[in-house]
Amino acid sequence: MDKEGRAHFRFYAPQASKLQVDCCGKKYDMWKDAGGLWTATTDPLPVGFHYYFLIADGVSVTDPSSYTFFGCCRVASGIEIPEGEEGNYYRPQQVPHGQVRSCTYYSETQKEFRRCMVYTPAEYETYPKKRYPVLYLQHGMGEDETGWSTQGRMNHIMDNLIASGKCVPMLVVMDSGDVEAPFRPRLGKDINEERALYGATFYDVILKDLIPMIDRTFRTKTDREHRAMAGLSWGGHQTFNTTLPHLDKFSYIGSFSGAIFGLDMKTCFNGVFSDADGFNKRVNYFFLGCGTEEQMGTKKMVESLCELGIKVDYYESKGTGHEWLTWRRCLKEFLPNLFKH
């Protein structure tokens, strides 16, 4: 990468006849020298994390010389265009570091073994009798349970906020939302009904399998006052569908660029928003955020909720779209408000 934010790619493939780099929605032709080394330079790229692919003779593949991530419904390569010092909140600093643990468990509802990722704060092993609140944090469509701790830098955000005293120590649990495959509505079916089915298997998993397993395995505070849920994009959709019908289990709710469409705020989820006083008393903190450059309808939703008297904290990430930089910023704004009521 150079100081103008352009990425320079080099790839050795002497037998390939055509190579391209697919990055940030644009395909760049690569040029081959006499020794079989291909090179390409991109336009200046926006800051933040971006997926990219190599296209070798028409076949899209990952870059074997870089780290891989699960995104775009497949294994992908990724590139980080660095911010300035304003991005230090998601970078590792000289502070105590927590752990991200990979946990395998059996889901009775799905009759399968599953994996979740669990962040424990740096002090977790130091205080063996202390119990912790829990945030359940969901990825978006086409990603999986690793997204928040790799693309999202969640663990560094947590470490830095806890060390600065802005955030209480907590566990963060990340599971697959069962939305790794693309959303493909069936022909002739109502689009909103099809959306309701996409990833719906996860709702019983989190309520009947995941939460009980976490409470058995880790030292958690098990009441609703110490349980939160948030998610990005389709994870925001899943957060609404999990928490709003089950406010007996959650008291903190967050949606980052939530894929929440076609809802009548007065009647959705059995009219949960129609009783503003009741909702505001039960939900300790309600957060909605998005980027200024995306069109997810979040701001209009906030306006509708405010008209009904719902207390909601709204955040806009300036200059960003439907991307990980937006969601990192949303998480940074959301976390300091948890478990302080």
What does each model-found stretch correspond to?
Residues 1-28, 32-341:
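Non-catalytic cap/lid and distal C-terminal segments of serine-dependent acyl enzymes
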